[in-house]
Amino acid sequence: MITVVTVPATTANLGPGFDCLGAALTLTNRFTFSLSDRPHVSVRGPEAAAVSSGPNNLAYRAYSRFYEYLGREAPPVYLEIDLRVPLARGLGSSATAIIGGLVGANRLAGFPLSHTEVLELAIEMEGHPDNVVPALLGGCRLAVQEDAGGWHWLEIPWDQDVVPILAIPDFELATETAREVLPPHCAYGDAIFNISHLGALLRGLETGQREWLQLALADRLHQPYRQSLIKGYPDLHRAALEAGAHGLVISGAGPTLLALGDPVTASAIATALKETWAKFDVQAQVEILAIQHQGTTVCDR
């Protein structure tokens, strides 16, 4: 039996939703599992050379972690990875690997774990929920943790006229580097600012109202510290707004930038971002995408 798992890229944080809000995008990685007499990993795609093809491969580690959790020996598999989500760009590439490995293992084991159990394992591996939850479930998702540690996730309605435009530069930014610039504590005023703006953002995404989205994308917990890691950020922000964007934020830990626009302004926003980054000698791939509502899919062939 051959099992194919397709996992969407994700954009996380969306401004004020630091480490709790993310959305699945119409850009995917594919993981193909077939039982074998020995473990083997094969990776293809534009950045395949940067991905381990041995036991340290993240998708294979997730596959092995699943069986470790069950207390069973992992059956050897031939794992083929079709890599389309850019690495270390703030698009949830690690989340696709973790979800791909766990879901593939769950299928081969006969689906012993629920979505909730798979996500708890994924959050344990990833360290935060904002990418893995929408990667598995699709749509825009808010992750909420209980005092006791358990997780819940809500689907956030996303108006079809709110268009995500992703500007993906030709340089990487490791998540660890982006986290190192964050202060260890935040002021009450900044926390309150983000709470109120997150509420406004959820309303803006649901209704598509420009005035809410323009207000809501501001953040004080992570973006002010990370903007210095992204060449030309002030100019890019200004160019996006002048082209008609509701706002511009850092996608995940960066360096990809996410602009929210509408069907009329999306093309102009994409052009403005590409041309502005070129002024800083940065070649950017700009994609006008949509929210992917299916989440991870599994099929056998």
Curated annotation (Swiss-Prot):
InterPro entries: GHMP_kinase_C_dom, GHMP_kinase_C_sf, GHMP_kinase_N_dom, GHMP_knse_ATP-bd_CS, Homoserine_kinase, Ribosomal_Su5_D2-typ_SF, Ribsml_uS5_D2-typ_fold_subgr
The gene coding this protein: thrB
Originating species: Thermosynechococcus vestitus (strain NIES-2133 / IAM M-273 / BP-1)
Listed name of the protein: Homoserine kinase
GO biological process, one term: threonine biosynthetic process
Protein task: Catalyzes the ATP-dependent phosphorylation of L-homoserine to L-homoserine phosphate.
Assigned EC number: 2.7.1.39
Top-level EC class: transferase
UniProt keyword annotation of Cytoplasm present: yes
Molecular function as annotated in GO: ATP binding; homoserine kinase activity
Subcellular location: Cytoplasm
Gene Ontology cellular-component annotations: cytoplasm
PANTHER family linked to this entry: HOMOSERINE KINASE, HOMOSERINE/4-DIPHOSPHOCYTIDYL-2-C-METHYL-D-ERYTHRITOL KINASE
A Pfam family reported for this protein in Swiss-Prot or TrEMBL: GHMP_kinases_N
Positions annotated to bind ATP: 86-96
Family that this chain belongs to: Belongs to the GHMP kinase family. Homoserine kinase subfamily.
UniProt keywords, alphabetically: Amino-acid biosynthesis, ATP-binding, Cytoplasm, Kinase, Nucleotide-binding, Threonine biosynthesis, Transferase
